[in-house]
Amino acid sequence: MAFAGLKKQINKANQYVTEKMGGAEGTKLDLDFMDMERKTDVTVELVEELQLKTKEFLQPNPTARAKMAAVKGISKLSGQAKSNTYPQPEGLLAECMLTYGKKLGEDNSVFAQALVEFGEALKQMADVKYSLDDNIKQNFLEPLHHMQTKDLKEVMHHRKKLQGRRLDFDCKRRRQAKDDEIRGAEDKFAESLQLAQVGMFNLLENDTEHVSQLVTFAEALYDFHSQCADVLRGLQETLQEKRAEAESRPRNEFVPKTLLDLNLDGGGGGLIDDGTPSHISSSASPLPSPMRSPAKSMAVTPNRQQQPCCQALYDFDPENPGELGFKENDIITLLNRVDDNWYEGAVNGRTGYFPQSYVQVQVPLPNGN
């Protein structure tokens, strides 16, 4: 069996070279089959590209995607399961508005109240966006992935097998092999032709299922934008009320305080007890010398100005998205410690992850890592 299989592979290779280099004519398939082959090839590219672009549509930040992929890869290597959620821009803006709205104080500031209302609305929109992501992944991306790994893979397998059996059949026919060998090769060729045709036909004629997936995608987008529109409509009404409230508030009068209001000690302060400025010589400057003491100027040590950093001991070539490559002796700024074995850092305007064993820490991170 092993020898027969090797002989068949040699025959196929010989026939392929003969057709390409020697001008031998192989068995031609009809135009309908060639058209199905072309459409199947387009479908293969479509499914691959559609999955990629849909993921970019749902998660448009390439840096965040690379970081998530890197963390996922590191988690697999370290055996630790870490869930990393894509940071929705609505959620990031909501966090900013909520934080500073509360810092300003909602009790006395209508602006602070408006910021908090806006932040809460954006937070709702971020939650709706996460629901959209889950919906599209489950009802659109997963069927595409199944089609890619099952249906298309099976069809391409039959096509590859058909090509091999066609070469074997033409080789035996060209060399005028025994009738039973030619007949056996022809039967296998016919079998593969049948399987390839049926597989491509079923794939290309499955428009109902494919269009249904597009309908689900469109419905998910419509629901997302409808819910966001409802949230924004409510936010707009609330902000208009806050604006009217701010306009109706009486304007507070403000009187700047003087030094007397601060109850400063008059001795040596340039003021006498009755508040009258003491006599100042016209030749003397009323302000202290702008020159700073050399000892005080040197009080800020260079170590306080240094950022956490490390020096590369060896070259590191990244193998996964999100990893940071560098050369030996490069100085890398430390940004974060991912786990016991990996750092996040920056060098030459690039950021990413790298193993701890490749570097020597010079200035540690603030937490001592």
Curated annotation (Swiss-Prot):
GO terms for cellular component: cytoplasm; cytosol; glutamatergic synapse; membrane; type I terminal bouton
GO MF: phospholipid binding
GO BP term, pick one: autophagosome assembly
Residue runs in coiled coils: 227-249
Sorted UniProt keywords: Coiled coil, Cytoplasm, Endocytosis, Membrane, Phosphoprotein, SH3 domain
Stretches the record annotates as Disordered: 275-297
InterPro entries xref list: AH/BAR_dom_sf (IPR027267), BAR_dom (IPR004148), Endophilin_A_SH3 (IPR035824), Endophilin_SH3RF (IPR050384), SH3-like_dom_sf (IPR036028), SH3_domain (IPR001452)
Function: Required presynaptically at the neuromuscular junction. Implicated in synaptic vesicle endocytosis.
Similarity section: Belongs to the endophilin family.
Identification of the protein by name: Endophilin-A
Residue ranges of domain SH3 in the record: 305-364
SMART domains (UniProt xref): BAR (SM00721), SH3 (SM00326)
Membrane topology: Peripheral membrane protein
Pfam families per the UniProt record, alphabetical: BAR, SH3_1
Compartments (UniProt record): Cytoplasm; Membrane
The BAR domain, residue ranges: 18-248
Segments of skewed composition (Low complexity): 275-294
Chief place of localization: cytoplasm
